[in-house]
């Protein structure tokens, strides 16, 4: 008789470790950014991929020309608006619930089935970004669930874990989550003040040693990332709904902060054009 119980693999399974040596350093030195500093990667965005959900969308970023660097792949489903349980307290606004989860195979190290602190942080930032766009007072005592599955993370699978690129990969992941969630909300017919899109800008230091601000950074294409910010932006209202900084910047140079945010807004505008074209094609 066949055993139908589900047998999971070991929780700590990983790919074989890759250690830093002269060969890896030479390969890493060849990974040079081919895009201009103000151009984001190409985005593929499609709505209506999950018929059973109220709204859904799929987003995929262009895969880097460098070997071993995967492109971000996200799937988002929206369930609602629907009535809250009778036991829940009255809410004059719609209750927004976000859930971000990596697939077990999405990153170099296998992810567990329970959400870790990284995924909870992404969910909190995503909820803050979407609350500024949704017109929540039109659905009193109702709720909507926004679920994002990260099918493939945006990282260099040939790099060692000690290089610390995972911190900066979260920025690009959050940016993609904001954009794909906005498309899924529009597909679900939930009223928003504007389409919100995410963008990332980073202060990087390459081999020549001079810092430079680039949009949509890939950590493997730069020697070092000093700081980065992820911006959720409403282009028609010229408003920022969420701003996330990471890294070290001199407190005395406020112009550098301003320039970094402006570059993040520029990346958000580029992503928003793809979002609007996708929704226009769907309606047409």
UniProtKB/Swiss-Prot annotation:
Tell me where it mainly resides. cytoplasm
Keywords from UniProt, A to Z, are:
Cytoplasm, Exosome, Nucleus, RNA-binding, rRNA processing
SUPFAM superfamilies for the chain = Ribonuclease PH domain 2-like, Ribosomal protein S5 domain 2-like
Q: Which GO terms describe its molecular function?
A: RNA binding
Query: What residue intervals traverse the membrane?
Result: none
List the Pfam families.
RNase_PH
Provide the Gene Ontology terms for cellular component: cytoplasmic exosome (RNase complex); nuclear exosome (RNase complex); nucleolus
> Organism's domain of life?
Eukaryota
Subcellular localization is given as: Cytoplasm; Nucleus, Nucleolus
Gene3D superfamilies annotated for this entry? Answer: GHMP Kinase, N-terminal domain
**A GO biological process this protein is involved in?**
poly(A)-dependent snoRNA 3'-end processing
Subunit and interaction comment: Component of the RNA exosome complex.
Family designation: Belongs to the RNase PH family.
What's its job? Non-catalytic component of the RNA exosome complex which has 3'->5' exoribonuclease activity and participates in a multitude of cellular RNA processing and degradation events.
Name assigned to this protein: Exosome complex component MTR3
Task: Name the species this protein comes from.
Answer: Chaetomium thermophilum (strain DSM 1495 / CBS 144.50 / IMI 039719) (Thermochaetoides thermophila)
Q: Which gene encodes it?
A: MTR3
């Amino acid at each position: 008789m066949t055993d139908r119980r589900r047998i999971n693999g070991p929780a700590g399974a990983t790919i074989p470790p890759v250690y830093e040596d002269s060969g890896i350093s030479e390969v890493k030195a060849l990974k040079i950014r081919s895009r201009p500093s103000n151009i984001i990667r190409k985005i593929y965005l499609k709505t209506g991929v999950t018929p059973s959900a109220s709204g859904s969308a799929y987003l995929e970023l262009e895969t880097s020309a460098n070997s071993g660097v995967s492109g971000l792949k996200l799937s988002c489903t929206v369930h609602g608006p629907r009535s809250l349980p009778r036991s829940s307290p009255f809410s004059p606004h719609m209750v927004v619930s976000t859930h971000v989860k990596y697939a077990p195979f999405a990153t170099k190290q296998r992810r567990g089935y329970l959400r870790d602190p990284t995924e909870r942080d992404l969910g909190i930032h995503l909820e803050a970004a979407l609350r500024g766009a949704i017109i929540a007072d039109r659905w009193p005592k109702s709720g909507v669930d926004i679920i994002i599955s990260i099918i493939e993370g945006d990282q260099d699978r040939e790099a060692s874990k000690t290089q610390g690129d995972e911190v900066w990969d979260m920025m690009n992941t959050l940016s993609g989550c904001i954009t794909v969630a906005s498309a899924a909300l529009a597909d679900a017919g939930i009223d928003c003040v504007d389409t919100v899109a995410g963008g990332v800008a980073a202060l990087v230091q390459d081999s020549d040693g001079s810092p430079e601000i680039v949009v949509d950074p890939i950590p493997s294409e730069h020697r070092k990332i000093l700081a980065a910010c992820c911006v959720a932006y409403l282009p028609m209202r010229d408003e920022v709904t969420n701003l996330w900084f990471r890294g070290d910047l001199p407190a005395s140079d406020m112009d550098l902060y301003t320039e970094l945010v402006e570059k993040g807004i520029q990346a958000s505008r580029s992503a928003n054009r793809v979002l609007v074209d996708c929704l226009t094609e769907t309606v047409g």
